[in-house]
Amino acid sequence: MTVEMRLDAHPRTETGRGAMRRLRRARRVPGVVYGAGKEPQPVALENDQLYRLLEEEAFFSTILKVQMGSETEQAIVKDLQRHPFKPLVQHIDLQRVREDQPITVHVPLHVHGEEQSPGVKKGGVLHHDLLDLEVVCLPKDLPPFIDVDVSSLKVGQAVHISELTLPEGVQSAALQQGEEYDAPVVSVQATRKTRGASSDDEAESSESE
């Protein structure tokens, strides 16, 4: 179930480094709301509210309700800059969305079935090649996450983008560019333990012959 997320944004007129510093001292985050055929609108957001939402995994793959005065805009996060060591957001870009226009969003991947994987049972290590997947879809079709089943993976095998089961109306941005972009999503890699077990199996097979 997708959780509705709301952001309070205050239109601002001041720009420049000095104005940005004053905003940040007041624990506000400078940002901009743009797109959907409208003029870009500089805004200021509350850092504490924004940081609480950042704790939600689906924050970057959710249609946000951005409240600006009496108006509500629907938007997605296109860029966010964090302070290198303080719990502060330095800047945020929000792109307006329209119900009839496709959007491109990074959606988190949920991997399951590791305990059942034959490769993991033999000592292989599950390697996450991708943590999220860039997808293209209409706003109404945007999923909060995408499932990745690794329960049948053996050592040396991988699940590729083309093998994922995407919801109806959702496409991989990479595969739209061509089959050569069909990257591995997750794989089971060999370790010394699995390589040793493989050698022992081969030796036993030779002796039995």
Swiss-Prot record:
Pfam family, one: Ribosomal_TL5_C
Stretches for region Disordered: 175-209
GO molecular function, one term: structural constituent of ribosome
InterPro entries recorded: Rbsml_bL25/Gln-tRNA_synth_N, Ribosomal_bL25/Gln-tRNA_synth, Ribosomal_bL25_b-dom, Ribosomal_bL25_C, Ribosomal_bL25_long, Ribosomal_L25_dom, Ribosomal_uL5_bac-type
Gene3D superfamilies tied to this protein: Ribosomal protein L25, beta domain, Ribosomal Protein L25, Chain P
Spans traversing the lipid bilayer: none
Any one GO biological process: translation
Keywords of this entry: Ribonucleoprotein, Ribosomal protein, RNA-binding, rRNA-binding
CDD domains xrefs: Ribosomal_L25_TL5_CTC
GO cellular component, one term: cytosolic large ribosomal subunit
Biased composition (Acidic residues): 199-209
Domain of life: Bacteria
Function, in words: This is one of the proteins that binds to the 5S RNA in the ribosome where it forms part of the central protuberance.
Family assignment from sequence similarity: Belongs to the bacterial ribosomal protein bL25 family. CTC subfamily.
Assembly behavior: Part of the 50S ribosomal subunit; part of the 5S rRNA/L5/L18/L25 subcomplex. Contacts the 5S rRNA. Binds to the 5S rRNA independently of L5 and L18.
Name under which the protein is recorded: Large ribosomal subunit protein bL25
